[in-house]
Amino acid sequence: MKKALLLVDLQNDFCPGGALAVNEGDRVIDVANRAIEACLDAGVTVIASQDWHPANHGSFAVNANTKVGELGELNGWPQIWWPVHCVQGTAGADFHPALNQSAIQWIVQKGTQPEIDSYSAFFDNGHRVKTELDEWLHANHITHLTILGLATDYCVKFSVLDAIALGYHTEVLVDGCRGVNLSPDDSESALREMAQRGAILTDMTQFLTTLSSVR
């Protein structure tokens, strides 16, 4: 058994003041740093995903001549239209400055194809193209993932569901997640779906206890 901690999209644009701010998104950073510190002590790999859109990305409402938050279709797939966010090379796409970035051993960038969105760290939304994440995890013999980040109901959820489908033992550090919640219960629904599909929902206390067993 070899574990890794996957930090999902802990970027400025998803935190308060950002272009697509998640309520209390910055509160996840302290949880992430505690988890990172524990992983370093236990010799557990720390990796991260980074939303990394070109400026002409098709999911941006301004590029689709639509309104933010409306549901439409992008190249045959359902698409929520988003504000411009996490554009490559901008401050909004950078990781939150309080995050312990020096501990991150590898970063997978996603959402780079302008014609399709990519919530999951493993695939685009159509499951047409894989990112490098699965290959990297296999090359490093990682079989168990703990996932936290932003947002619970989108990029965390779809990363978790893909991880399970690909055969990884997957747990979600719930107190390290916050949701967009276009509908008030979206995050709770996402957590239920993840659990129903086989994810283990955990909190920091349980995570630290479990992590001590791998030392």
Regions found by a protein language model. Give the residues of each.
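Short acidic-hydrophobic, aromatic-tinged amphipathic segments that line or gate anion-handling sites
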Residues: 198-210
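Active-site flanking residues adjacent to catalytic metal/cofactor-binding acidic residues
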Residues: 8, 50, 174
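Histidine-anchored nucleotide/phosphate-binding helix
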Residues: 35-36, 156-167
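A short glycine-rich beta-strand->turn/loop micro-motif centered on a GG-aromatic cluster
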Residues: 146-149, 169-181
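Short glycine-enriched, charge-decorated loop/helix-capping segments at active-site entrances
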Residues: 18-25, 121-125
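Extreme N-terminal starter segment of soluble prokaryotic enzymes
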Residues: 1-5
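Short catalytic helix/loop segments, enriched in acidic residues and glycine
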Residues: 22-37
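Active-site alpha/beta core segments
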Residues: 33-144
